């Protein structure tokens, strides 16, 4: 493609830094596979030195994904770079992304280093990273608040050292579009060897301007944008991949570049990330929200019926919405089930996983007349999640009576041993959670509890999301069922398993 715009997805690294959005290794692999199908150019799989879990996630994604460049973040430290290089050994194509802070406040207060020392360390880091891969990215952290003369100096030095991508982060989301675009254009114009590297933008959404700032960067010469599915990320989030990609593609009259992204997988990627992290997509979210292509006003409806382009600037099916989706039911066979999952971008590593998902599908079909794509994705997500859980919900019995306390009896399998507990309290969900907690012995603080319907109708699957805090660690749990209390129990158990898996998890840096 002439004048290609590179898409660098950091959902698995920066996106995971959203409180409660921590992902297991297997969940990261599932998301990475969808990103690969979307033809994402670079997947930042994690921060290898942060923990054993992060190292294994980067290593596994590097071994599984073949068609995207796999990247690991590292500070400008020898130990970080060596760890990243080791984790990326199995990658078909790899990149090391190293960074150091360049703003006055960061250099003085955090690093306690002089500008000369910072340049020296950045150059040394790039040269060390080149031992492992020819594809090295350098980021001057907090570039948005850094002195431009110093930025030019350190960028020139790191390009001379071998950096092939220079990423300019607006770490705290402080810039506005015109300002950020001018910065990108100025840096490209002032750095003597800028033609030897691709310039990139990494914007945060603290002022709601991440996508706008990134687009401004593209208009001013950036040819890589770092983004996340659903705009997931620290604080207010990052540049939304789906919004960035479709803005560039829809406004080809303004942008003289395009991406290789297969946009038909955007919706399935959005739903998978939402399901894994528990961060529900707001209905009015651009591109992937439930109302993104809905028209209620009579004049709008009439216009769309007569000629779609009167009120729609994109086709819904281009990003994965299927107006003529196949509705499955109790009489649908295994092949139709498998074919539909494939169309949704869902794959299983073995027949056992497919068989388990099909069994759950049949169980749901006995309770629900029509099963839609959203139901299938929820079922598959639950199937793939439970395969590696140490705590499993065996059964739940709840007794309720108006004006009386509710009783919940829970049977859990903990390390393959069944245990039973009963709790009595004013609420059925509360009683269920108390009974579960009494069996696990894990002290949990419930920070968030939300319920939503996966599809329409009184027989719809209910999706419950919980956010749990344990010893300062925040995780999300998700469960689906036609019964809300059962879905709540599944979500709570899912969260507890994440708590167990998240021990010794290190804190990630901000860029």
Curated annotation (Swiss-Prot):
Protein's UniProt keywords contain Metal-binding: yes
InterPro entries: 2-IPM_HCS-like, 2-isopropylmalate_synth_dimer, AIPM/Hcit_synth_CS, Aldolase_TIM, LeuA/HCS_post-cat, LeuA_allosteric_dom_sf, LeuA_bact_synth, PYR_CT
GO biological process: L-leucine biosynthetic process
Subcellular location: Cytoplasm
Pfam families, sorted: HCS_D2 (PF22617), HMGL-like (PF00682), LeuA_dimer (PF08502)
Any single GO CC term annotated in Swiss-Prot or TrEMBL for this entry: cytosol
Domain named Pyruvate carboxyltransferase: residues: 5-267
Binding site for Mn(2+): 14, 202, 204, 238
Residues that span the membrane, as ranges: none
Pathway: Amino-acid biosynthesis; L-leucine biosynthesis; L-leucine from 3-methyl-2-oxobutanoate: step 1/4
Record field: catalytic activity: 3-methyl-2-oxobutanoate + acetyl-CoA + H2O = (2S)-2-isopropylmalate + CoA + H(+)
Keyword Thylakoid found: no
Cofactor(s) this protein requires: Mn(2+)
EC numbers, comma separated: 2.3.3.13
Highest taxon of the lineage: Bacteria
Subunit structure: Homodimer.
Protein name in the entry: 2-isopropylmalate synthase
């Amino acid at each position: 493609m002439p004048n290609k715009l590179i898409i660098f997805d950091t959902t698995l690294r920066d996106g995971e830094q959203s409180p409660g959005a921590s992902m297991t290794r297997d969940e990261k692999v599932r998301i990475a596979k969808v990103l690969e199908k979307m033809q994402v150019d670079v997947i930042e799989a994690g921060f290898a030195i942060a923990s054993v879990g992060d190292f294994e996630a980067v290593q596994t994604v590097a071994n599984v994904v073949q068609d995207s460049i796999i990247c690991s973040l590292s500070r400008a430290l020898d130990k970080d770079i060596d760890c990243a290089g080791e984790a990326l050994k199995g990658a078909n194509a790899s990149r090391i992304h190293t960074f150091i802070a360049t703003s006055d406040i960061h250099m003085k207060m955090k690093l306690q280093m002089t500008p000369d020392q910072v340049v020296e360390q950045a150059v040394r880091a790039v040269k060390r990273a080149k031992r492992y891969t020819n594809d090295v990215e350098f980021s001057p952290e907090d570039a948005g608040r850094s002195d431009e003369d110093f930025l030019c100096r350190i960028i020139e030095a790191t390009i001379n050292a071998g950096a092939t991508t220079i990423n300019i982060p607006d770490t705290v989301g402080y810039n506005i579009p015109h300002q950020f675009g001018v910065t990108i254009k100025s840096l490209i114009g002032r750095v003597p060897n800028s033609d030897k590297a691709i310039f990139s933008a990494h914007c945060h959404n603290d002022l709601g301007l991440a996508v706008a700032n990134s687009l401004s960067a593209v208009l001013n010469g950036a040819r890589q944008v770092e983004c996340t599915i659903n705009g997931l990320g620290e604080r207010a989030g990052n540049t939304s991949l789906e919004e960035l990609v479709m803005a560039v593609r829809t406004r080809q009259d303004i942008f003289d570049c395009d991406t290789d992204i297969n946009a038909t997988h955007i919706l399935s990627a959005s739903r998978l990330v939402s399901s894994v992290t528990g961060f529900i997509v707001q209905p009015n979210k651009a591109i992937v929200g439930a109302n993104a292509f809905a028209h209620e006003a009579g004049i709008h409806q009439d216009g769309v019926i007569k000629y779609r382009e009167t009120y729609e600037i994109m086709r819904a099916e281009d990003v994965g919405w299927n107006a003529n989706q196949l509705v499955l039911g109790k009489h649908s066979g295994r092949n139709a089930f498998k074919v539909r999952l494939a169309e949704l971008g869902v794959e299983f590593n073995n027949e056992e996983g497919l068989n388990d998902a099909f069994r759950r599908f049949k169980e749901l079909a006995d309770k629900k007349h029509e099963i839609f794509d959203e139901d299938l994705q929820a079922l598959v997500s639950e199937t793939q999640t439970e395969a590696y859980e140490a705590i499993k919900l065996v059964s739940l019995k709840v007794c309720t009576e108006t004006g009386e306390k509710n009783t919940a009896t829970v049977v859990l399998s903990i390390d393959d041993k069944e245990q039973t507990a009963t709790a009595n309290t004013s609420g059925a969900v509360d009683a269920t959670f108390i009974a579960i907690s009494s069996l696990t012995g894990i002290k949990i603080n419930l920070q968030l509890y939300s319920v939503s319907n996966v599809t329409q109708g009184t027989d719809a699957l209910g999706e419950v999301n919980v956010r749990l805090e344990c010893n300062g660690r925040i995780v999300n749990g998700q469960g689906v069922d036609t019964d809300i209390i059962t879905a709540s129990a599944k979500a709570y158990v899912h969260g507890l398993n994440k708590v167990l898996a998240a021990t010794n998890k290190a804190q990630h840096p901000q860029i």
